């Protein structure tokens, strides 16, 4: 289903986007895609820290773009001025059957000419940076989240450290309280940029068996060149 986001620079639009990302790591699917880049480039700057979920997503996509870029196609996302809520309520009018975007999810508002120009400039900069292939090593900090408070965190960490490949070295780790008795695993790793794609590592190892028995989601908290 295509997703339509509108005026994500307004307070109302950012709040809706924050609610939308509450249970999601990406705009669509289970890995970063062109949908994320479309929304990312529509934001002229990093969102305020009060938008916790948007900030988490924004920092994650920033890190991915600095590392290996975003290549997945996604499901299709638009940033436009037509407005409707993410979860339509009873008093909202149903879209006409012949409208092209009747299945779209719209986080409302309008985009100004200045915002469009800023988005275009940002898209050009991201596209240019994506073509640069950097060599060397990087230090990465991951947030690995369990399914619930009953998840065995020792086995979760074991599943993470069992991922072995050329150019990957696991480092220090700690458990950080999240709330409601749930803790997340923060773990450092050092990678050789030309050999390890963090996005692929998460998608291919953490979100597949047996690791996905313990891991609900994983986010990149920090990504720094060494």
Curated annotation (Swiss-Prot):
Stretches the record annotates as Disordered: 82-131
InterPro entries assigned to the protein according to its UniProt record, in alphabetical order: eEF-1beta-like_sf, EF1B_bsu/dsu, EF1B_bsu/dsu_GNE, Glutathione-S-Trfase_C_sf, Transl_elong_EF1B/ribsomal_bS6, Transl_elong_EF1B_B/D_CS
Keywords on record: Elongation factor, Protein biosynthesis
Disulfide bond sites: none
GO terms, biological process: translational elongation
Annotated Gene3D superfamilies: 1.20.1050.130, 3.30.70.60
Homology family: Belongs to the EF-1-beta/EF-1-delta family.
Protein name: Elongation factor 1-delta 2
Organism of provenance: Oryza sativa subsp. japonica (Rice)
């Amino acid at each position: 289903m295509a997703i339509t986001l509108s005026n994500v620079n307004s307070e109302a639009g950012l709040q809706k986007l924050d609610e939308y990302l509450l249970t999601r790591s990406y705009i669509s699917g289970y890995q970063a895609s062109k949908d994320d880049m479309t929304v990312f480039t529509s934001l002229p700057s990093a969102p305020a820290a009060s938008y916790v979920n948007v900030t988490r997503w924004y920092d994650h996509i920033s890190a991915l773009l600095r590392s290996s870029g975003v290549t997945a196609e996604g499901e299709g996302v638009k940033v436009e001025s037509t407005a409707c809520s993410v979860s339509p309520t009873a008093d909202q009018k149903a879209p006409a059957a012949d409208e092209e975007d009747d299945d779209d999810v719209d986080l409302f508002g309008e985009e100004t000419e200045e915002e469009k120009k800023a988005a275009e400039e940002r898209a050009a900069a991201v596209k240019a940076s994506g073509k640069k292939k950097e060599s060397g090593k990087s230090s990465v900090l991951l947030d690995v989240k369990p399914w619930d408070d009953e998840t065995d965190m020792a086995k979760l960490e074991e599943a993470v450290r069992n991922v072995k490949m050329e150019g990957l070295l696991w480092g220090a780790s700690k458990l950080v309280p999240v709330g409601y008795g749930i803790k997340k695993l923060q773990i450092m790793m050092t990678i050789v940029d030309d050999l390890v794609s963090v996005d692929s590592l998460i998608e291919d190892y953490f979100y597949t068996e047996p690791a996905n028995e313990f891991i609900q989601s994983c986010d990149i908290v920090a990504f720094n060149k060494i």
